Design a protein with these regions (language model features):
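HIT superfamily nucleotide-processing domains
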Residues: 66-200
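Histidine-centered catalytic micro-motifs used for acid/base chemistry in nuclease
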Residues: 22-28
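Short cysteine-rich loop/turn motifs with clustered Cys
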Residues: 1-21, 44-46
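Short beta-strand-alpha-helix junction that forms the catalytic/metal-binding core
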Residues: 9, 31-50, 166-171
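A generic "alpha-helical surface" signal
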Residues: 3, 38, 42, 124-131
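Short Cys/His-centered divalent metal-binding micro-motifs
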Residues: 17, 40-64
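Short, intrinsically disordered, charge-biased short linear motifs at domain edges
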Residues: 28-34, 57-62
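Short metal-coordination and nucleic-acid-contact micro-motifs, chiefly zinc-binding Cys/His arrays
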Residues: 2-6, 36-40, 65-69
Length: 200
C-alpha cells in the first residue's frame, strides 16, 4: 500500500518524510468494509484522524487528480523541462519569477496540477499556494527594503484578462512612487473605477 502511494498521503499529498503515513480502510469495517487490498489507502496521520471511521470517501482518486498535466501548457511544461525557473516549491505548488514583471520581484504561484483557474483548485492546493506566497513575501521584504506593499491576485477567464489557462497567482511588490497615485489599487483594472472616493 505504501509503495503504491509513492510515499505521499493519498489525500493531501504530503510526503512520508514530513508526516508519518498510516494504512487504513477506505470503507470502515464498522460500515461493512473488508480486509482486502482494494479497500486500503495510505493517509498521513492528520488526514486519517480527520477521516475517522464514519467516512467512506476513497481518497485514492485524489492521486490521479493531483497528477494531471496537459501538453502544450506553459506551466505544466516548466515543471518537466525548465525547472531552473522554479524558485520554490512544495508538494502541490511551485513559484517562478514572472517573465514579464510588472515590478522587480513579481512572482507567480501555480498548482502543479493542470487546472484552469483559482475556482478549480481543491483546498489542499489553495493551502500549498498560500504557504509559498507567504514565504516569498517574507524573502522579498527581507531582501529589498524599498518594498512597502504588495498587490496579489489572479485573472480567471478570458474576459478578466487571463491568457495562460493554468491557474496562477500574481504577487507584485509595490514601492513608494512606482505610480503617481496608488489609491484604488486593483480597482484600476476597470478604467475610471479606481478613484471611487471622488464619486461620493
Amino acid at each position: 500500500m505504501l509503495s503504491r502511494a509513492k510515499g505521499r498521503c493519498e489525500l493531501c499529498g504530503i510526503t512520508n518524510e514530513q508526516k508519518m503515513l498510516e494504512v487504513d480502510h477506505i470503507f470502515p469495517k464498522s460500515l461493512g468494509g473488508k480486509d482486502d487490498l482494494s479497500n486500503y489507502q495510505a493517509l498521513c496521520y492528520s488526514c486519517n484522524a480527520a477521516k475517522r471511521n464514519t467516512d467512506d470517501t476513497d481518497f485514492r482518486l485524489f492521486k490521479t487528480l493531483y497528477e494531471h498535466r496537459e501538453d502544450n501548457c506553459l506551466f505544466c511544461d516548466i515543471q518537466a523541462n525548465d525547472r531552473k525557473r522554479i524558485i520554490a516549491e512544495n508538494n502541490l505548488a511551485y513559484a517562478i519569477r514572472d517573465g514579464f514583471p510588472v515590478t522587480d520581484g513579481h512572482t507567480l504561484f501555480m498548482p502543479k496540477r493542470h487546472v484552469n483557474d483559482y475556482f478549480g483548485l481543491v483546498q489542499s492546493e489553495v493551502n500549498a499556494i498560500n504557504i509559498l506566497v507567504q514565504e516569498q513575501r517574507t524573502l522579498l521584504m527581507a531582501s529589498d527594503s524599498s518594498i512597502e506593499g504588495f498587490n496579489i491576485g489572479m485573472n480567471c477567464g478570458e474576459v478578466s484578462g487571463q491568457t495562460v489557462f493554468h491557474c496562477h497567482v500574481h504577487l507584485i511588490p509595490r514601492r513608494r512612487g512606482d505610480v503617481a497615485n496608488p489609491r484604488g489599487g486593483v480597482r484600476h483594472i476597470i478604467a475610471d473605477k479606481g478613484f471611487y472616493e471622488d464619486k461620493k
